[in-house]
């Protein structure tokens, strides 16, 4: 048995399972925190993943609803309930995911009230040799964001990727990825631009690299990122490097974070194969 993906909404999971049944592929749903879709015949994995990518691009396509009717039902037998917005957030996010989101929001509010410079004096990467033993600074730069778009973009990806890692691999794994990527991406960025930078994007890029490569090399880990999204991440890095959008980006942190995530995923997937 091979786990293909997970859906927060069981109706969406059932729609995909029904469609694949019309294509001659039998999938099953197991209910845990989310609806996990499993494939018994692993020889069809590539075909199923290709169909999944098309499904995720437009799950509302009429052919998927038609497949449910063709399968003889539109009711999966599962008990559904409508999730309000915050309940949907809570469904995917574990405690570490939530703590980081809250910390970033609190710091952002403090920056609006006190000013960026005042907060950076306390949280920025050590900008003076006398501060090198204030160890929190090697990590707290990731909490600072300088615009509403900046924090929304990073927290959305953090929730999506960090939540998946925490739910599937545990809080400890998410903490390790976060600390290592914050430290190393911060170190590289301060070499590029000095100590005055901030944002969770180095960690987010680490999670992108980790989730994508771990999903490719170890599908049974239960985490997965579409190749199109990792391509988008690479394009964004190139755009930032050549300043195509006229925006100030932490290019060093992005590249270092992505490299950290890929390296950690490679090691973890090797260890997973050795245990089999």
UniProtKB/Swiss-Prot annotation:
Localization per Swiss-Prot or TrEMBL: Cell inner membrane
Catalytic activity: Cleaves type-1 transmembrane domains using a catalytic dyad composed of serine and histidine that are contributed by different transmembrane domains
Topology of this chain in the membrane: Multi-pass membrane protein
Keyword flag Protease: yes
Transmembrane regions listed in the UniProt entry: 94-114, 142-162, 169-189, 192-212, 229-249, 250-270
Signal peptide: none
Active site: 201 (nucleophile), 254
GO biological process: proteolysis
A Pfam match: Rhomboid_N
GO molecular function: serine-type endopeptidase activity
Main location (coarse class): membrane
Keywords on record: Cell inner membrane, Cell membrane, Hydrolase, Membrane, Protease, Serine protease, Transmembrane, Transmembrane helix
Annotated EC: 3.4.21.105
GO annotations of cellular component type: plasma membrane
Family, per entry: Belongs to the peptidase S54 family.
Role of this protein: Rhomboid-type serine protease that catalyzes intramembrane proteolysis.
NCBIfam families referenced in this protein's UniProt entry, alphabetically: PRK10907.1, rhombo_GlpG
Name of this protein: Rhomboid protease GlpG
Gene: glpG
């Amino acid at each position: 048995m091979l786990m293909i993906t997970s859906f927060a909404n069981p109706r969406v999971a059932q729609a995909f399972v029904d469609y694949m049944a019309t294509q001659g592929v039998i999938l099953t749903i197991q209910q845990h925190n989310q609806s996990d879709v499993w494939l018994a015949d692993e020889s069809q994995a590539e075909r199923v993943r290709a169909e999944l990518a098309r499904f995720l691009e437009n799950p509302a396509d009429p052919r998927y609803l038609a497949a449910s009717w063709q399968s003889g039902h539109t009711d999966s037998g599962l008990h559904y309930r409508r999730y309000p917005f915050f309940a949907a957030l809570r469904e995917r996010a574990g405690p570490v995911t939530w703590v980081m989101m809250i910390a970033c929001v609190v710091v952002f509010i403090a920056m609006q009230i006190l000013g960026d410079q005042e907060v950076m004096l306390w949280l920025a990467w050590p900008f003076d040799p006398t501060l090198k033993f204030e160890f929190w600074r090697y990590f707290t730069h990731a909490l600072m964001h300088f615009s509403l778009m900046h924090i929304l973009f990073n927290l959305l990806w953090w929730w999506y990727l960090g939540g998946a890692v925490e739910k599937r691999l545990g809080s400890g794994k998410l903490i390790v990825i976060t600390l290592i990527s914050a430290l190393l991406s911060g170190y590289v960025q301060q070499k590029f631009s000095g100590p005055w930078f901030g944002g969770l994007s180095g960690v987010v890029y680490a999670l992108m690299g980790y989730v994508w490569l771990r999903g490719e090399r170890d599908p049974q880990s239960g985490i997965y990122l579409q190749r199109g999204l990792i391509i988008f991440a690479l394009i964004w890095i190139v755009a930032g490097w050549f300043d195509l959008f006229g925006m100030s980006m932490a290019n060093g942190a992005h590249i270092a974070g992505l490299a950290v995530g890929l390296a950690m995923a490679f090691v973890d997937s090797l260890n997973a194969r050795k245990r089999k």
